[in-house]
Design a protein with these regions (language model features):
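A conserved beta-strand-loop-helix scaffold within acyl/acetyltransferase catalytic domains
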Residues: 2-52, 59-69, 118-141, 146-259
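Short loop/turn motifs at secondary-structure junctions
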Residues: 43, 109-111, 278
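Aromatic (often tryptophan-rich) hydrophobic motifs at membrane interfaces
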Residues: 48-59, 79, 87-103, 210-322
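Active-site/acyl-donor-binding loops of N-acyltransferases
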Residues: 46, 59, 63, 67, ...
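Acyl-group handling in specialized metabolite and lipid biosynthesis
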Residues: 84-88, 149-152
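Conserved acyl-donor/pantetheine-binding loop and adjacent beta-alpha core of acyl/acetyltransferases
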Residues: 63-83
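Non-catalytic accessory segments adjacent to catalytic cores
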Residues: 92-138
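Short catalytic-loop micro-motif centered on adjacent basic/acidic residues
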Residues: 112-114, 177, 281-285
Length: 344
């Protein structure tokens, strides 16, 4: 078994490998790899484990540059899950890839390397040489239960609070549909910026919204679900599809309509649609440990809690003396280390 880099020679074999296991996700895909390169102008260094001429494991990673140095992330951009992709729990494959990842960061003279594990991965017991550790709560709903056979009582699979929210949206005549046109994305962007301003949250860059339409295939790779009250758009939800999993990516809502719960109906209809198309899982993404309200909301959708981790190796101790503002400015979409580890 040897370690290699994913190049054009291996692209089709890599895509075939991802299809072999139901737990590979959107962030592992070739399409997302190319998307990150265009969006962030980063270098891709996807590691693959090859045995007998066949890919048996992978670890997606990209190299990010700032004025003060470089970092290696698996993966960057709002906590995109990377980590080891392997479907049989082969400890040798895992160890080869993880060691290769941290050695790559060292050889590239990075400030640090950060590997974000996938909540779907069943990690064998490994020796991981890291300096800092961060944790998130992954939450995943099994949506296979949402089929036409249960059309009369399918919302009963969810918590009482979620059922009330869905019924409230219906009672208020909220209508939902898929709209992948430019004007729908303009609404998504504007509402996303308003929502983030309200909570002082980090915004997706403007280029992101244009690039999604240009780079991915609508209906196959993504859908933008829209909710209307009469003729007015009041909520939207961007989701991505890959293999057996749907990624809950950008939810937005016009705040004066929050009380009638249009987003809950959007989520429900998008889940049903994905289930009918053969998808198994709805990945809510990571939740910080200090976000109990967000955690409870997802839990009411029958989501299972699966913790996952950020494994960070620091190569240059000067990093600990940098300010949080400097790191955020130079690496806006990368993760170098937990800020509570800084000396400043």
């Amino acid at each position: 078994m040897k370690l290699d880099l994913l190049t054009s020679k291996w692209e089709s074999a890599y895509e075939k490998f991802l299809e072999e296991g139901e737990t590979s996700i959107f962030y592992h895909s070739n399409a997302f790899r190319r998307f990150l390169k265009r969006l962030l102008s980063v270098e891709d260094h996807y590691l693959i484990a090859v045995e007998g001429g066949k890919i048996v494991g992978a670890l997606p990673a990209v190299l990010c540059r700032g004025k003060v140095g470089k970092c290696l992330n698996s993966l960057p951009f709002f906590g995109s899950n990377g980590g080891v992709v392997e479907f049989e729990g082969n400890k040798k494959v895992w160890q080869l890839l993880i060691n290769g990842f941290f050695e790559l960061g060292k050889s590239k003279e990075c400030l640090s390397s950060n590997m974000i594990s996938s909540p779907f991965a069943e990690n064998p017991e490994l020796d991981i040489d890291y300096d800092c550790l961060d944790k998130r709560i992954g939450q995943i709903s099994d949506i296979r239960i949402l089929t036409d056979k249960d059309s009369n009582n399918e919302i009963d699979h969810f918590g009482a609070f979620t059922r009330r929210m869905i019924r409230k949206a219906r009672k208020n005549s909220i209508e939902v549909k898929v709209e992948n046109e430019k004007n729908a994305f303009e609404f998504l962007k504007a509402c996303h910026y308003e929502n983030m301003d309200d909570i002082n949250g980090k915004k997706k860059p403007e280029f992101f919204f244009h690039l999604v339409m240009d780079h991915f295939n609508e209906g196959k790779d993504y859908n933008l679900w829209m909710a209307y009250k009469g003729s007015r758009p009041v909520a939207a939800l961007l989701i991505f599809y890959f293999n057996r999993t749907v990624e809950y990516y950008i939810p937005v809502i016009v705040k004066e309509y929050r009380s009638i719960q249009p987003l809950s109906l959007l989520i429900y209809e998008a889940m049903k649609d994905a289930s009918k198309k053969g998808y198994y899982y709805w990945n809510w993404g990571g939740t910080h440990l200090d976000q109990p309200g967000v955690h409870r909301f997802k839990k009411q959708w029958n989501a299972v809690n699966i913790p996952y981790y950020y494994y960070i190796k620091v190569y240059d101790n000067h990093l600990f003396s940098y300010s949080e503002d400097l790191i955020r400015r130079e690496f806006p979409y990368c993760y170098l280390l937990p800020f509570n580890e800084l000396n400043t």
